[in-house]
């Protein structure tokens, strides 16, 4: 089907949706909000204690939130671990998720959700082509499917799209997607659900990417920043791992920061890093993290092994459970940065950071209607994909263009008027970097993550 036909079909679908879909969600859940550089549950500081959850990995891509029986089976294990959050990398936005999301809510568990799938994502080798209206329709439909649940903690706009110096040229498109998601949430009059990015932990541009996602006008800035970190390999320590330097370098950062993946498996995992992550050594800067990963897949990071309805606990399960049981959150507010705020945009430093100005691509023209009409029904996993389909952006966005359409609601929980302190960009030898636990469907697909 030609791109023009796809666009026309989407327009027909969108025109029939004048309001957000009705979702039977729990009303007695306290949503997570952003204050300064921290998350809060009401007036109490919220630290993410979670795992990454995508049973089946790359060999059998499935939506675990649409699998009510499997979800309830695994919630029992989540509760045993003492979790309050799970991350899911791919969901089918054509399916119903009420039963699992409500069961998670009953267990006090929140969801951090990646909006992308392997077929609907930004291609780091062709970011301009893959940032199109067909792609945006898919991820907006995913927002529609989950925004009604109060235990939807946050959305990830991408995962490790930038994984080296040359791929940093895709950063404006990652930031544009983040902007568009935030604008869609506000324009559709959903509650303020944080949107951020999950970065690769690479010395070449980790700090620059963090700075970039928190610079510019409020409508362009992210609500949080996260990165995947496998640099603490037991036996280790706060200093030996280099985590002390990362805390130093991120001190003064104006957004909530957390680990979207952690848990090096080079040696026997004891999860010694848990005691540091939830201590005052780090809580002024970090808001917890997500252990990779719940189910045993080919990369051998699993806490449990799933076979049908049976779940077998592996040694790492007990190790993590013990680490969490021994580690409580700090009392009070954890010395968070109450001011928050924007920082200056990073200067171009090719080949490590190949972004030469602050300009972002404008939202593709056919996608603008979704802000007022809604995205329509999501195509789900069966959809044809968006990598080379749809209409691309043809203009540069003006500052403020990501403000809500037909709404005066605030675009962020923090303000650039209170500028964050400057971050310290480390030398490339700051700390060892261990190869992460995830691979992509293709070496060029950034956001479409497939777990192994």
Curated annotation (Swiss-Prot):
The GPI-like anchor contains a phosphoceramide lipid group. The anchor position has not been determined. This is 1,3-beta-glucanosyltransferase gel1. It comes from Aspergillus fumigatus (strain CBS 144.89 / FGSC A1163 / CEA10) (Neosartorya fumigata). Disulfide bonds join 71-100, 215-345, 233-264. Its main location: membrane. It is found in: Cell membrane. Glycans are attached at residues 249, 337. Residues 1-19 form the signal peptide. PANTHER family: 1,3-BETA-GLUCANOSYLTRANSFERASE GAS1, 1,3-BETA-GLUCANOSYLTRANSFERASE GAS5. Optimum pH is 5. Active from pH 2.5 to 6.0. Its EC number is 2.4.1.-. Keywords: Cell membrane, Disulfide bond, Glycoprotein, GPI-anchor, Lipoprotein, Membrane, Signal, Transferase. (1,3-beta-D-glucosyl)n 2 binds at residues 160, 201, 206. Residues 393-419 have a biased composition (Low complexity). It comes from the Eukaryota. The gene is gel1. Residues 325-340 have a biased composition (Polar residues). GO terms for molecular function: 1,3-beta-glucanosyltransferase activity. GO terms for biological process: fungal-type cell wall (1->3)-beta-D-glucan biosynthetic process; fungal-type cell wall organization. The active site is at 160 (proton donor), 261 (nucleophile).
């Amino acid at each position: 089907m030609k791109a023009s036909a796809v666009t026309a079909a989407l327009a027909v679908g969108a025109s029939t949706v004048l309001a957000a879909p009705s979702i039977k969600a729990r009303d007695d859940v306290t949503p997570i909000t952003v204050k300064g550089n921290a998350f809060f549950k009401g007036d109490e500081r919220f630290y993410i204690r979670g795992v990454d959850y995508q049973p089946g990995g790359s060999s059998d891509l499935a939506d675990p939130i649409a699998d009510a029986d499997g979800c309830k089976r695994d919630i029992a294990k989540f509760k045993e671990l003492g979790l309050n959050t799970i991350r899911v990398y791919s969901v089918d936005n054509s399916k119903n998720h009420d039963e699992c999301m409500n069961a998670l809510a009953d267990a006090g568990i929140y969801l951090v959700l990646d909006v992308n799938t392997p077929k609907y994502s930004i291609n780091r080798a062709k970011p301009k082509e893959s940032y199109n209206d067909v792609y945006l329709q898919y991820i907006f439909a995913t927002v529609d499917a989950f925004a009604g649940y109060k235990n939807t903690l946050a959305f990830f706009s991408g995962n490790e799209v930038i994984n080296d110096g040359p791929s940093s040229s895709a950063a404006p498109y990652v930031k544009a997607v983040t902007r568009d998601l935030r604008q869609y949430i506000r324009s559709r009059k959903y509650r303020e659900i944080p949107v951020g990015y999950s970065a690769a932990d690479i010395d070449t541009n980790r700090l620059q990417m963090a700075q970039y996602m928190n610079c510019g006008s409020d409508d362009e800035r992210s609500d949080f920043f996260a990165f995947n970190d496998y640099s603490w390999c037991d036996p280790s320590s706060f200093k030996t791992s280099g985590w002390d330097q990362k805390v130093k370098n991120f001190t003064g950062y104006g957004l909530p920061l957390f680990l979207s993946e952690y848990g090096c498996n080079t040696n026997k995992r004891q999860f010694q890093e848990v005691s540091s992550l939830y201590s005052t050594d780090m809580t002024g800067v970090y808001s917890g993290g997500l252990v990779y990963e719940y189910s045993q897949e080919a990369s051998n990071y699993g806490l449990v092994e799933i076979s049908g309805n049976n779940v077998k606990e592996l040694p790492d399960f007990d190790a993590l459970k013990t680490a969490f049981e021994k580690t409580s959150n700090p009392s009070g507010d954890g010395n968070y940065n109450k001011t928050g705020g924007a920082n200056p945009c990073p200067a171009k430093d090719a080949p490590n950071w190949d972004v030469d100005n602050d300009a972002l691509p404008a939202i593709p023209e056919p996608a603008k209607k979704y802000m007022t009409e809604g995205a329509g029904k999501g195509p789900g996993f069966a959809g044809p994909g968006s990598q080379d389909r749809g209409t691309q952006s043809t203009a540069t966005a003006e500052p403020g263009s990501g403000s809500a359409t037909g709404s005066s609601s605030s675009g962020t929980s923090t303000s650039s008027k209170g500028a964050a302190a400057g971050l310290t960009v480390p030398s490339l030898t700051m700390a060892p970097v261990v190869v992460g636990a995830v691979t992509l469907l293709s070496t060029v697909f950034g956001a479409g993550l497939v777990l192994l």
